[in-house]
Amino acid sequence: MRRFRFFTIALAIALVATAVAAQEHSGRSGGERSGHGEQGRQEQGGPGVLSLLPTDSVTEHTIGTAAGKLAYTATAGTFALFDQSGERSAAIFYTAFVARSANPTRPVTFVFNGGPGAGSAFLNLGMVGPRIAAFGNGFDGSSVRLVDNPDTWLAFTDLVLIDPVGTGWSRPAKPDGGSSFWGVHRDAESMAKVIALYVAKNSRVSSPKYILGESYGGFRAAKVARVLQTSQGIVPSGILMVSPMIEGHFQFGGDQFALGAALQLPSLAAAELERKGTFTPAALAQVEHFALTDYLAALAGPPLRGDAAHAFYARVAQMTGLPEDVVTRERGFIRDAYVKNLRPGDHKIVSHYDATFAVDDPNPEQASGRGPDPFLDGFIRAYGSAFVAYARDELGFKTDMTYNLLASDISGKWDWEDGGGHSQPSAAEDLRQLLALTPSFRLMIAHGYSDLVTPFAVSRYILNHMPPNVEGERAELRLYRGGHMFYTDPQSRKAFTADARTIYAAP
């Protein structure tokens, strides 16, 4: 399973603690409790750990948007899932934000993070929700606070953020029941069922339905959309993917085969251009051309010798910032060597999640860069405690259950073969079918330039090899400054929100 080490923001980590973070309460205007929904009274609690779950909480709020004040209803609660024998198999936690309008055709977007094993707090408090986590000066999770989100997607779509079983406050009914959900197809089926339940119970059949997923959540989005069509009779209008894993063979072969390395190189070069202050899309386009021509040919062919080897490795070193001797030693397959060798002697370690992000190396004496990631295991952990405080203090959902922001045990137990899959997971065929079967279906894929976990060039390669009839606006790639969670940069978040809005405005 080593090739999945960097699958998403959910790998190689334990459950996050639920300490309450400091926050502002400016977004609580109009946020008084309005009681519990009928669904919450029906589905609260349950056996074992599920007894810690309270009834659904419904609160009313307002937020300022570019179009003026927006009143909305927030629901924090759970859906019950049942097995074939009619026994309760799981409780699925969700957070819904619904504008108080009388328009029955307002879009609704179903949102989840990745992992497998990541909760939805990242996208909730990081990008789309009405409240957002602010980290102050720099990336310091010790000072996180909540503020109104000026770029909330609630301005143009209702939102339903879902935590898969084992993440957030979603739990299997039995302690050993997770295996019933922790597989590619089983996961997609359970998420599709939750979406179908929400649509039915909230009379959203007439609403255009979109899916937003990050990292493995992008892969999940394609699988869920197909299950919705085939098993639930629900046809999604589109998918938006943030830093998605689409083709595992390409995305995790950067140190194994030539094409994988070639699709990694532009992200490494993007980070070096950022460090030099010379980043432009035009400069990066030159790297992309080199990556799929001279670089790919050199790595795929016999080992270079003599002057040709020196010239080639020197060029790669200049593009990436790595010392030439390191590039030569690795014969151009440089991703894994990158994190510990970028600046020999400075004792820094670089993040795979954002190659521009580096911190002091906690183990400079070790040759390998494996271990905690500066970005993944750093400030972003504060999203967990921030969400616990948000749910308790503003949404009225109070529980002593641990909020699982990132669950490493799920990733380790995931069944990649589930549902007739292959050892290298792929969602490209699902996207082809979705685009072919629904002529109005829209796909937007968003990436950060300096993400080494899910390099943007992989998605470009996949889109370039889609059938000709889906080219253009129906399937598009958008790129932003930053890494895997590029939305932690306010300017990139604002730009992506504006781009995403065009999907919803399309006829």
Segments the model singles out, each with a brief description of its role:
Residues 154-157, 164, 181-200:
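Alpha/beta-hydrolase active-site loop
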Residues 213-226:
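Glycine-rich nucleophile elbow surrounding the catalytic serine of serine-hydrolase chemistry
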Residues 131-134, 229-321:
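A catalytic-pocket lid/entrance helix-loop region that shapes and gates access to the active site
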Residues 483-492:
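Catalytic histidine-centered segment of alpha/beta-hydrolase-like enzymes
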Residues 306-453:
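Alpha/beta-hydrolase fold catalytic core
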Residues 223, 441, 455-465:
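Short alpha-helix in the alpha/beta-hydrolase fold that links the catalytic acid
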Residues 27-45, 86-180, 464:
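N-terminal cap/lid subdomain of alpha/beta-hydrolase-fold enzymes
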Residues 204-216:
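Alpha/beta-hydrolase fold nucleophile elbow
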